């Protein structure tokens, strides 16, 4: 990341007497149509990014450090924001205090390689359940659980030799996966490579996402879905 000219001056100018925390702006020099993996994380843009955030020493002392268990993209930012909200910190913004953040090209199948971060959502939910439901995900991702249930039904039907049950499970999986694929394509880049990426990863994401949610729930001992 590269600070823009006047970054510190603009930040200090926006830091009023009653301000506890000031957030600058992070800008990408070549904004592009988002790839699917950038929208699959299940979270909105963090309202606070520690990479461009100014905080009074007294507030940092009151926070008593950071939870180092959050070691995956944006979760540490969200957790800091939630803690500041709970302590009723006065948060201001300075859009002129800008940091430039170049975006590297995403590799093929990036969505799958990002899914392990979902396990940290369980910890975020355990520490801040109400804020998590208000600001991150209001309801569990039932779509993914329904797709996994369809896979289980299809497999059980095949194992039991029940063609009707197997066909019902396969049909439900196909319809639900197609709906997921269409939703992920909406507003995303439409290159041939990216479309192929979405077709493949849409079939693999639901079981992988459910797996990592279960791992997170077990690791952090919380009922989380």
List each model region and its residues:
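Conserved donor NDP-sugar-binding/catalytic core segment of glycosyltransferases
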Residues: 1-36, 90, 95-98, 102
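Hydrophobic/aromatic residue at the end of a short beta strand that borders the catalytic acidic motif
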Residues: 1-4, 28, 55, 76, ...
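Alpha-helical elements of Rossmann-like donor-binding domains used by nucleotide-donor carbohydrate transfer enzymes
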Residues: 6-10, 79-83, 120-123, 209, ...
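Short, P/G- and charge-enriched loop/turn segments at secondary-structure junctions
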Residues: 38-44
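Conserved nucleotide-sugar donor-binding
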Residues: 49-64
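Basic/Trp-rich segment in TM-proximal cytosolic loops or flexible interdomain/linker regions
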Residues: 103, 107-166, 190-196
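Membrane-embedded multi-pass helical conduit in multi-pass membrane proteins
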Residues: 146-220
């Amino acid at each position: 990341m590269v600070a823009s000219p006047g970054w510190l001056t603009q930040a200090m100018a926006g830091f009023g007497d009653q301000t506890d925390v000031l957030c600058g702006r992070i800008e990408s020099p070549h904004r592009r149509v988002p790839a699917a993996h950038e929208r699959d994380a299940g979270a909105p843009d963090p309202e606070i990014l520690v990479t461009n955030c100014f905080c009074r020493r007294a507030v940092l002392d009151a926070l008593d450090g950071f939870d180092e268990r959050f070691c995956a993209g944006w979760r540490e930012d969200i957790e800091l924001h939630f803690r500041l909200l709970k302590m009723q910190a006065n948060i201001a913004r300075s859009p002129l205090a800008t940091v430039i953040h170049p975006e590297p090209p995403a590799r093929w199948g990036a969505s799958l390689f990002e899914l392990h971060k979902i396990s940290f959502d369980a910890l975020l939910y355990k520490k801040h359940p109400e804020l998590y439901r208000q600001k991150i995900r209001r309801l569990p991702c039932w779509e993914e659980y329904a797709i996994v249930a369809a896979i289980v039904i299809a497999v059980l039907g095949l194992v039991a030799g029940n063609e009707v049950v197997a066909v019902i499970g396969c049909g439900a999986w196909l319809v639900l996966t197609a709906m997921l694929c269409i939703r992920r394509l909406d507003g995303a880049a439409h290159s041939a490579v990216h479309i192929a990426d979405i077709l493949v990863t849409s079939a693999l994401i639901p079981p992988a996402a459910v797996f990592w949610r279960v791992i997170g729930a077990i690791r952090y001992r919380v009922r989380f879905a």
